[in-house]
Regions:
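Non-catalytic, low-complexity flexible loops and terminal extensions
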Residues: 1-58
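Short charge-dense sequence patches
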Residues: 5-11, 19-29, 76-85, 195-204
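Amphipathic alpha-helical recognition patches that constitute DNA-binding helices
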Residues: 7-9, 13, 65, 69, ...
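Gly/Ser/Thr-rich phosphate-binding loops and adjoining beta-strand/alpha-helix segments
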Residues: 33-96, 228-230
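Acyl-thioester-dependent acyl-group transfer interface
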Residues: 79-248
Length: 248
């Protein structure tokens, strides 16, 4: 029977990417870098809703992207919940367009990590200008490709080795720690808020089973926009109660 062809861009030239953006040489200090300790307790799920307009108002008042305003608010809330003054957060960027494969159906992303230092009197306006500048720098095509090359170089080198799959998996995990993936929380935005509602988005906000687990972080926060309401789908591996109250 006839099937509709699935259109996907061909694979990008990883060897050319590695040649253009060579990975820095690893040293003894690379293996000894400090890595944030993440919680690995039983997963608990929380939904938090806020109006899209309230987030936009916060962003406009501070002259930053809504994404940055949300990240800043989460950092302030999680300081009390996690009991830490230094909060590390990570996010991923879609690199398909920058890599010249806009219709790729395979995974084509890079990840960035930043940290923010907080105190008792820290306000949103104190932290979001620097956070926003960092986000804007990292989302430039050249910066995304360079980061993607550095993160893929580890995968590329390990894949070339003649070793059992279980050994490669362990080495991949070590590479994640070296590249600084672990964070207090991951933040991602699902869907395009300018497009009409889709069944997939509606299902996502209700079905825990389709949420993305927070690998490499104490919690994963996925924000989706639907009918003027932003839903935060949070999977939390920290043992402390009271996350929802902290976010309010």
């Amino acid at each position: 029977f006839a099937n509709t062809p699935i259109v996907s861009s061909p694979a990008y030239d990883i060897e050319a990417m590695m040649a253009k953006y060579p990975a820095p040489e690893a040293s003894e200090s690379t293996l000894q870098r400090d890595v944030v300790q993440t919680w690995e307790c039983k997963m608990r799920r929380t939904r938090v809703r806020l109006t899209k307009q309230s987030l936009v108002d916060k962003a406009v008042a501070n002259g930053v992207k809504p994404f940055t305003a949300l990240a800043g608010l989460l950092c302030l809330a999680l300081r009390g919940y996690l009991g830490k003054d230094d909060i590390q957060y990570s996010y991923s960027a879609d690199t398909r367009k920058a890599a010249g494969v806009p219709d790729a159906l395979y995974n084509c992303v890079c990840s960035f990590q930043h940290s923010v230092k907080l105190g008792d009197g820290t306000r949103l306006a104190d932290i979001v200008p620097e956070m926003d500048a960092a986000v804007r720098r990292t989302l430039q095509p050249e910066a995304m490709l360079r980061q993607m090359a550095q993160q893929m170089s580890w995968v590329y080198k390990v894949d070339q080795q003649k070793a059992p799959l279980r050994i490669k998996q362990r080495v991949f995990q070590m590479g994640e720690y070296i590249s600084g993936v672990p964070a207090d929380f991951w933040l991602s935005y699902l869907g395009n808020p300018l497009l009409p509602a889709t069944p997939e988005i509606q299902t996502y906000t209700k079905d825990f089973n389709v949420w993305v687990p927070p690998d490499g972080g104490s919690m994963g926060v996925e924000a989706s926009s639907l009918n003027g309401v932003i839903t935060l789908c949070i999977e939390n591996k920290a043992e402390m109660p009271g996350l929802a109250a902290s976010l309010r």
